Amino acid sequence: MLLLLKKIYLTFARSSRIIITLVIIDQLSKWWFIDNLRWKPGLMLKVTAFLNMVYTWNYGISFGLMREYYQYSNAVFILTNSIIVCYLYYLMVCSKTIRGFAGYSFVIGGAVGNLIDRLFRGAVFDFIHFYYKNYSFPVFNLADCFITIGVIILIEDYYSTKKIIEEKAKEHYDNAQIKAMAEKIRNTDHNGDNKI
């Protein structure tokens, strides 16, 4: 128990710097654009031929989905997001790689940034809008970027770790032994008893 508490504390001490930095960057960017875009004509600042900064409140989930249920759902979104952040933190504590740790830190930082918006503003502020001719990508914010970066890191970590495990297994066992072990694992339940 003491070892687990120590691991949780060390994970918090290490991850909090990353998470807090990402949350500060996200909240400062939102604050700046809220303060400066509300006075622009059409609530928009044209940056390039394919990028605008726009003043948009997202009352739904990612990319504005379910926004029509806002009056019933904001409390549900806050509760769900809080549970997800706690679960992601648990996964980060269990993570065995630096990439996994970094990936979870980015996802948690982005999720907390959007959670702060929901708690204190009632909706998530989105401002980055990419478009090309008739195609328009849904408006998003830096917290969404952090979540996406974190997910990409976690996917890469999963596949690179899987590859390393497979290579180490091949060094120590031949293919027949690996297949036999996999078959034994498939035929054993979670209590270690044979299913057959």
Swiss-Prot record:
GO biological process: proteolysis
Catalytic activity: Release of signal peptides from bacterial membrane prolipoproteins. Hydrolyzes -Xaa-Yaa-Zaa-|-(S,diacylglyceryl)Cys-, in which Xaa is hydrophobic (preferably Leu), and Yaa (Ala or Ser) and Zaa (Gly or Ala) have small, neutral side chains
Coiled-coil zones: none
Keywords: Aspartyl protease, Cell inner membrane, Cell membrane, Hydrolase, Membrane, Protease, Transmembrane, Transmembrane helix
Catalytic class of the enzyme: hydrolase
Membrane topology summary: Multi-pass membrane protein
Subcellular location: Cell inner membrane
Keyword Hydrolase (UniProt): yes
Pathway stated in the Swiss-Prot or TrEMBL entry: Protein modification; lipoprotein biosynthesis (signal peptide cleavage)
Catalytic site positions: D126, D144
InterPro entries according to UniProt: Peptidase_A8
Ranges annotated as spanning the membrane: 43-63, 75-95, 100-120, 135-155
A Gene Ontology term for the protein's cellular component: plasma membrane
Gene Ontology MF terms: aspartic-type endopeptidase activity
PROSITE patterns the record matches: SPASE_II
Listed EC numbers: 3.4.23.36
Pfam family, any one: Peptidase_A8
Function summary: This protein specifically catalyzes the removal of signal peptides from prolipoproteins.
HAMAP family linked to this entry: LspA
Family listed: Belongs to the peptidase A8 family.
Protein known as: Lipoprotein signal peptidase
Phylogenetic placement of the source organism: Bacteria, Pseudomonadati, Pseudomonadota, Alphaproteobacteria, Rickettsiales
